[in-house]
A protein has these predicted regions:
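Acidic, Mg2+-coordinating catalytic module of metal-dependent nucleases/exonucleases
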Residues: 87-90, 94, 99, 103-104, ...
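Conserved non-catalytic scaffold segment of RNase H-like nuclease domains
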Residues: 1-117, 127-130, 135-154
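Charged interaction scaffolds used for protein-protein
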Residues: 205-207
Length: 207
């Protein structure tokens, strides 16, 4: 059976798990070997705490907006079923893993690391393949000429889609030693529709 790659991103209320910050949006996108999105799990979350104003300026999610969203404990079973046994790729993976482990611990769930096959960090991979230059998701999209026209704010869903393309570009670079051709971020009709609609605190399944 082919290895299943899932591209994950979270948005949070701040930067410190130990300081009480929580996950307020989570997305996991399954993509093929060319980075094209196949299906996705996405939801906003009620973090049950106030939003840091700096974090809000980055992702645009306010405390009041998230009040009607599900709590992590309400979606953890669906989330774990989606990621089970897969290889997870995240940009600065330690950050996302720590926050997700924190949410699972609060909800009495199992370990995230123990629920998946392995966790890969695209930032670390980029550092090994591209020793010079910036390695943020934005910088890598620019370097690989990946279109980001659907990205106005940081958002877990669009960032996960873009990460799939970045990972495919890094793989092509590693295998062939050449830069891949420019691409426009691939979005399924369902994902494109979700991104065009006003942000809504609603559980979204794609595919």
């Amino acid at each position: 059976m082919a290895e299943r790659f899932l591209f994950l991103d979270t948005e949070t209320t701040g930067l410190s798990v130990t300081g009480g910050d929580r996950v307020c949006e989570i997305a996991v996108v399954e993509a093929d070997e060319k980075g094209r999105a196949i299906r996705a799990f996405h939801t906003y979350l009620n973090p049950e705490c106030r939003m840091n104003h700096v974090a809000q300026s980055i992702h645009g999610l306010s405390t009041s907006f998230l009040l009607g969203a599900p709590r992590f404990a309400e979606i953890q079973d669906e989330f774990l079923a989606f990621v089970k046994g897969a290889t997870i790729v995240a940009h600065n993976a330690t950050f996302d893993q720590h926050f997700i482990e924190g949410e699972l611990a609060r909800a009495g769930g199992p370990s995230f690391f123990g629920s998946v096959k392995k966790i890969e960090c695209s930032w670390r991979r980029a550092r090994s393949l591209l020793p010079v230059g910036k390695r943020s998701l934005e910088a890598l999209c620019e370097r690989f000429e990946i279109g980001t026209v659907d990205r106005s704010l940081h958002g877990a869903l669009i960032d996960s889609v873009l990460l799939g393309h970045v990972w495919a570009s890094l793989t092509a670079l590693e295998k062939g030693g050449v830069m891949p051709l420019p691409v426009q971020a691939n979005l399924t009709p369902e994902i494109r529709l979700a991104l065009r609609q006003p942000r809504t605190p609603k559980l979204v399944w794609e595919g």
